[in-house]
């Protein structure tokens, strides 16, 4: 099972957890969860006016070996207006635009989508059962 929790944070709200959204999916090949502004295809939906987040920004896909992968999907713009980081404990990694990284099995961490133009972020915590 992959469990996700999402909080949208703006300026003075840093550290607040009000309005947290949750989603989970079984670790089965082909299972998928998405994060973005499009309510039709995303399990976790960000505010409509947060344009630094694409309609479908992040995708969590379970592969054939039951390992989850995080992808930052390429949007309609050639240059993104955000940056995405994967943080697991003391380890932090920038996720490339249009790129994919595996999530650690039996681990927990956070994916941070940071607005490049202001103090806003989408923080997605994850727990991947081992």
Over which residues does each language-model region extend?
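Short hydrophobic/aromatic patches on the structural cores and recognition surfaces of FHA
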Residues: 35, 57-61, 66-87
